[in-house]
A protein has these predicted regions:
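DNA polymerase processivity clamps
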Residues: 1-43, 58-179
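Bateman (tandem CBS) regulatory domains
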Residues: 53-57
Length: 179
């Protein structure tokens, strides 16, 4: 189902408490509520096998307050967007802090340190698309997130720290080569 369709449906269902009936037909889906019929086309093609994308080994793990992290990335993205690639750099520091930075040749550099709750494993120097990271962070409820790294050029996984089932919701971010 296209993301835009799900977003619109979510807005319509914001306060709905009754059950929803779903019907699939050909390349369309129909959501039926008491006073609403919502049609959407389905995306064509086969969905990629994501189980191979999600890393199973972890070399480093970071626990950080999602709101503080999101705000730091948002501020760094203001400058990164000037360069059109929106690349944010993350580097772990020895004192339990994480440095979030970006630069734009025309404008300058920005760097901000954010305290982490914990960090274990190898030092991290990684770059990523700021918009993707902010979208991932906004999807979580709760205060803290756990980020698992399996290498500097391997995808990394974000999960809510205190989730009953840690695999219930996860976000996968692929790094950008800059270091």
């Amino acid at each position: 189902i296209p993301g835009k369709s799900l977003s619109e449906l979510n807005k319509l269902l914001d306060d709905a408490s009754e059950s929803i009936e779903m019907t699939l037909a050909n390349n369309q889906i129909l959501f039926k509520l008491k006073d609403l019929l919502f049609y959407s086309r389905l995306l064509e093609g086969s969905y990629p096998d994501t189980s191979r994308l999600i890393p199973t080994d972890t070399k480093s793990e970071l626990v950080i307050n999602s709101k503080a992290f999101l705000q730091a990335i948002d501020r760094a993205s203001l400058l990164a967007r000037e360069n059109r690639n929106n690349v944010i750099k993350l580097m772990t520091l020895e004192n339990g802090q994480v440095e979030v930075s970006s630069n734009s040749p025309e404008v300058g550099n920005v760097s901000e340190n954010v305290f982490s709750q914990s960090f274990t494993g190898e030092e991290i120097k990684i770059s990523f698309n700021g918009k993707y990271m902010m979208d991932a962070l906004r999807a979580f409820e709760g205060d803290d997130i756990q980020i698992s790294f399996s290498g500097t050029m391997r995808p990394f996984v974000l999960r809510p720290k205190d989730a009953a089932n840690p695999n219930e919701i996860l976000q996968l971010i692929t790094p950008v080569r800059t270091y």
